[in-house]
Amino acid sequence: MKPTLLLLAAGMGSRYGGLKQLDGLGPNGETIMDYSIYDAIQAGFGKIVFVIRKDFEDQFREKILSKYEGHIPAELCFQALDDLPEGFSVPEGREKPWGTNHAVLMAKDIIKEPFCVINCDDFYNRDCFMVIGKFLSELPEGSKNRYAMVGFRVGNTLSENGTVARGICSKDADENLTTCVERTEIMRIDGKVSYKDEQGEWVAVGDNTPVSMNVSSWWLFPPISPPQRRPSPRSTASGSKPGPTTETSGPPGR
């Protein structure tokens, strides 16, 4: 069974000033996610699913989905603020889409096989997809609720144009992820990688500290498990269920 690539593409692009997921940057107008999809296909992925917003469906079908017809199965699902599990409601005044868990939940009726989740607007490298594809392909038959995350060395994910947001990770001796705390301001200061903590102080970390760039593989049984049926907070995440990490050197940061 070939794994599926799930691309999170419902962002509003408020800082960028538009739908950067649709903007071409390659010599033939390729988008960032086109490169990820190509590398994932080379790594053995057999289907792609996009999570988008309904309001730009027509643009997305024309600019993105149409180019994959006849090459690989591709489907859309839609993230909406009010599409919430029972007992949840949208806070007054909220317009920003929910986080990763909610986006993944939107694909619950489409994905029935092992899958990998990525951001559509981050550039990864082929090694990333080879690593995660290998993990999924080597899981024993009948595996249930298995997860992994590709860790990148933070020093390789920085930008020359300002701070970046990354999940600072820690792991145990068996390579299990123990914590992942999102830091929204990371940059190099006086030659050292540093992030700003809750008190506004800069904290230095080693260049090889593993960080999350939102690349994770999921093998869920049932396909979307009950713990995922909750919106996820965007500020801080802590691993409640340890999972293995795999490490790659990492691409340039956005």
PLM region descriptions:
Residues G18-L19:
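Conserved catalytic-core motifs of eukaryotic protein kinase domains, centered on the activation segment
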Residues E69-I72, E141-N145, P244:
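Short helix-terminating capping/connector loops at secondary-structure junctions
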Residues I118-D121, F152:
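Active-site flanking residues adjacent to catalytic metal/cofactor-binding acidic residues
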Residues M1-G13, P27-V117, Y124-N125, F129, ...:
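Conserved N-terminal catalytic core of the sugar/cofactor nucleotidyltransferase
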Residues R229-R254:
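A C-terminal functional module that forms or caps the active site or interfaces directly
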Residues R126-S216:
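Conserved core of the sugar-phosphate nucleotidyltransferase
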Residues N214-I224:
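Conserved beta strand-loop-helix elements of the APE1-like EEP
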